Amino acid sequence: MGIEDGIVEHLPRLRRYARALLRDPVAADDLVQSCVERALGKQRLFKPGTNMRAWLFTIMHNVHINLARKQMQTANTMPLDQAAELPATPPSQEDALRVRDLAAALEQLPDEQRQVVLLVGLEGLSYKETADVLVAPVGTVMSRLARGREKLRALLEGNGAPHLRRVK
């Protein structure tokens, strides 16, 4: 399998992580495109037999950090007319409310915790792979994940009130 095939295989995971990280489909697609361009340009640096998924997520993380630094230096506006992608089948109302609550809770996490929760929980990376992507010790990844999960749990349990009230 060539590097191009490996990148294509991991595109859905890269897009999912970018969308969860940025919460803006257009910016997420731009991040994925930049990541793929960088990976293709640096393919000579990839060591065959190593973990391509971790390599790609590391590139994405670095591109994201660089873009965030640039955005801090220049004022950036967000378009108001961002259309959400609709799923193939609409979720039940209860599922939609759960997803909304989870997305809102994820937004309240500090960036470091949200990144770890998304990489481990959503993308299924191991602690070691996540540590490599974020350039952090495995112990730091584990503590950020534990704190992030605990905060998510507290936020979601705080939303334990019913979404609909009975009207008399």
Where are these regions (language model features)?
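Sigma70-family region 2
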Residues: 34-51, 70-71
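A short, charge-rich alpha-helical start-of-domain segment used by transcription regulators
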Residues: 1-16, 26-29
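Acidic, proline/glycine-rich intrinsically disordered inter-domain spacer in sigma factors
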Residues: 82-107
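Short hydrophobic short-linear motifs embedded
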Residues: 80, 161-168
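A short pre-motif secondary-structure segment
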Residues: 116-120
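Arg/Lys-rich amphipathic alpha helix in sigma70-family domain 2
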Residues: 45-47, 58-78, 95
